[in-house]
Swiss-Prot record:
Cellular compartments annotated: Cytoplasm
InterPro entries according to UniProt: 4pyrrol_synth_GluAld_NH2Trfase, Aminotrans_3, Aminotrans_3_PPA_site, PyrdxlP-dep_Trfase, PyrdxlP-dep_Trfase_major, PyrdxlP-dep_Trfase_small
Required cofactor names: pyridoxal 5'-phosphate
Name of protein: Glutamate-1-semialdehyde 2,1-aminomutase
EC number: 5.4.3.8
Assembly behavior: Homodimer.
GO cellular component: cytoplasm
Record-linked PANTHER family: GLUTAMATE-1-SEMIALDEHYDE 2,1-AMINOMUTASE (PTHR43713), GLUTAMATE-1-SEMIALDEHYDE 2,1-AMINOMUTASE 1, CHLOROPLASTIC-RELATED (PTHR43713:SF3)
One Pfam family named in its UniProt record: Aminotran_3
Keyword Cytoplasm set for record: yes
Reaction catalysis annotation: (S)-4-amino-5-oxopentanoate = 5-aminolevulinate
An MF annotation (GO) of this entry: glutamate-1-semialdehyde 2,1-aminomutase activity
Modified residues (N6-(pyridoxal phosphate)lysine): 272
């Protein structure tokens, strides 16, 4: 792992200053770099596929603010749209035409969605969707999957992923046992366990919520039939099927994972990309369900800045640019993501370092494994087989060469339409140096 050197000296000073006034020095736990050790890198600007830290070091960025920046940093069209709207007003607390325009575009892109409600974060989206599911069914139990992260609402911080996985916390202090008791967790990809649960308690279950790709415990793909099997179980037992596409939405395909794999959820949670880099979330779905949301119906949900015009125009511009008349740039990003993933796999084979690399659309993930032949398909396996110490050495070897990856192997990576073939070449060249270093350090 990297030690503090002149390369990161200002980040070290900034971190010390931040810890005096911010708990842990960061405003979201994974940013503290606990998953890789050392100090967090402080950034000051970004452009296209690149970010620069406060020490002036340039990096090819594969975090992209944890996914929202599909077009890369400071895309000219997005910057112009935000600037023009800011000059007109940043928030009105009243309806705008931008909300309707973005709603129509999302409905056009995602086949299952008939109506949508914008909120301010992915956490608000999942929390509201689950409240809606309980209102619609009159039931109380929620089913989620170990290692899947759906935000930090009390009922969802049970065997969660993301920062909770990085920090090794099974759940969070402050969550009342009575709240946690209404969330049942089972292993991701275990359809038999889900079927057994429904056979035993199906009449009590309001909803099943799942990430189509478990990208908050690394990068775990669904087994064939897993997601469609969950859809069938919920239909049979009258529960609501919620697909959390906060991360995969508009990242793996224009219509999300559900369009890619032919799924028809009752409700969908969105975020990240639909805000174009500004705070946003949304829950959406069938008209019959969404008509229960106030003021159309009795289920209350509100927000001072929900649907604010800055986020709406940033999201609208992002989606129009990515999936408008020419979606070639998005397809090129998909191709480059696959090339990066293939290159990492080949390096693992060449240097005899066991890795598990996955990719779909513009998302990817890379586990370093404790032993050859292991395969991670669930949270239990991720905890058992993932070699976090080796990943930490790899992370810093890449950072020292100007490649910024997620500071935890329990987080996914992302590409943007701004990443070039030359960026992939540079990244794989750096990765070869890093893999060679892992071999030499083990000898």
């Amino acid at each position: 792992m990297s030690v503090v050197t002149e390369r990161y000296s200002r980040s070290q000073a900034d971190y010390a200053a931040a810890r005096e006034v911010i708990p842990g020095g960061v405003n979201s736990p994974v940013r503290a770099f606990r998953g890789v050790g050392g100090i967090p890198i402080f950034f000051e600007r970004g452009q296209g596929a690149y970010v620069w830290d406060v020490d002036g070091n340039r990096y090819i960025d594969y975090v992209l603010s944890w996914g929202p920046l599909l077009l890369g940093h400071a895309h000219p069209a997005v910057v112009e749209a935000i600037t023009l709207q800011a000059q007109r007003g940043t928030s009105f607390g009243a309806p705008t035409e931008l909300e309707t325009e973005l709603a129509r575009l999302v409905i056009e892109l995602v086949p299952s969605i008939e109506q949508i409600r914008f909120v301010n974060s992915g956490t608000e989206a999942t929390m509201s969707a689950l409240r809606l599911a309980r209102a619609a069914t009159g039931r109380r139990l929620i089913v989620k999957f170990n290692g899947c992260y759906h935000g930090h609402a009390d009922m969802l911080l049970v065997q969660a992923g993301s920062g909770v996985a990085t920090l090794g916390l099974p759940d969070s202090p402050g969550v009342p046992p009575s709240v946690a008791a209404e969330t049942i967790t089972i292993e991701y990809n275990d359809l038999d366990a889900a079927a057994a649960l429904f056979a035993n308690r199906g009449a009590e279950i309001a909803a099943v919520i799942v990430e189509p790709i478990a990208a908050n415990m690394g990068f775990v793909l669904p087994k064939p039939g897993f997601l469609s099997g969950l859809r069938e179980l919920t239909q049979t037992h009258g529960a609501i099927f919620i697909l959390d596409e906060v991360m995969t939405g508009f990242r793996v395909a224009a219509g999300g994972a559900q369009a890619l794999w032919g799924l028809d959820p009752d409700l969908t949670c969105l975020g990240k990309v639909i805000g174009g880099g500004l705070p946003v979330g949304a829950y959406a779905g069938k008209r019959q369900l969404m008509q229960l949301v106030a003021p159309a119906g009795p289920m209350y949900q509100a927000g001072t800045l929900s649907g604010n015009p800055l986020a709406m125009t940033a999201g609208l511009t992002t989606l129009r640019t990515a999936f408008g008349g020419d979606a070639g740039a998005f397809q090129q990003a998909v191709t480059r993501t696959a090339r990066l993933a293939d290159g990492l796999r080949m390096l693992g084979e060449r240097y005899r370092i066991p890795v598990q690399v996955g990719n779909v659309g513009t998302m990817f993930g890379c586990y370093f494994l404790r032993q050859e032949g292991s395969q991670i398909t669930s949270y239990a396996e991720a905890k058992a087989y993932a070699d976090s110490q080796r990943y930490a050495r790899f992370f810093w070897a890449m950072a020292d060469q100007g490649i910024y990856l997620a500071p935890s192997q329990f987080e996914a990576g992302f590409l943007s339409t701004a990443h070039s073939d030359a960026d992939i070449d540079e990244t794989l060249a750096a990765a070869e140096v890093a893999f060679a270093g892992l071999v030499s350090s083990a000898e």
